[in-house]
Design a protein with these regions (language model features):
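Conserved catalytic submotifs in the C-terminal HATPase_c
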Residues: 12-17, 34, 39-49
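Acidic ATP/Mg2+-coordinating residue in the GHKL
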Residues: 98
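Short helix-loop "hinge" at the ATP-lid/N-box region of the Bergerat-fold HATPase_c
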Residues: 69-70
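Short beta-strand/loop element within the Bergerat-fold HATPase_c
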Residues: 78-90
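Conserved micro-motifs of the catalytic ATP-binding
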Residues: 6-11, 50-53
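Short helix N-cap motif at coil->helix boundaries in the Bergerat
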Residues: 18, 102-110
Length: 169
């Protein structure tokens, strides 16, 4: 995370297809999710899905959101993850929604802060330092994107990423 604080990170950006990236990540996570009895559902609706991003960092950001969905699931229930891509005006959107334990309303504003961790009441043995979502936000911000979090305790969480569409020159 310190490399982001110093702004010394150098992105190796290239043109990629978000729909393809999402399908690959969903495929990678399917066994972990199915192991809980759950499933990943994808709605690939974006027509303009070209993005200009650093593949490693952007993929890590999406993977982090998926990983959190699995880690913070309700222990007694299968986790279902719903991934959707779509376009609206000149933006490309990606949402990742789960039916996990959710986040209290007062904690939603803090989830992107460095070292902030939502207290889970020791239901989960989740390791970490509270840097994952701060990293995700920084990566999205540095790609001229936006990320927002919606959640309801006991019902699940949804992260929505918005990016500029890459147009042909």
């Amino acid at each position: 995370m310190s490399m982001f604080d110093k702004k010394s990170i150098v992105f190796k950006k290239k043109e990629l297809d978000l729909n393809e990236m999402v399908e690959n990540i969903a495929s990678t996570f399917s066994l972990r999710v199915e192991h809980t009895g759950g499933k990943i559902f994808t709605e690939i609706e974006a027509v303009d899905s070209a993005i200009y991003v650093d593949e490693l960092h952007f993929q890590n950001a999406i993977t982090n959101l998926m990983d959190n969905a699995v880690k913070y699931r309700k222990p007694e229930e299968p986790i279902n993850i719903f991934i959707r891509t779509w376009n609206d005006n000149d933006r490309l959107y990606l949402s990742i929604r789960d039916n996990g334990q959710g986040i209290k309303r007062e904690n939603i504003k803090k989830v992107f802060e460095k070292f902030y961790r939502v207290h889970t009441g020791n239901k989960h043995d989740v390791k970490g330092f509270g840097l994952g979502l701060a990293y995700v936000k920084k990566v999205i911000d540095l790609h001229q994107g936006e990320i927002k979090c919606e959640s309801e305790l006991g019902k699940g969480t949804k992260f929505t990423i918005s990016l500029p569409v890459l147009h042909e020159q």
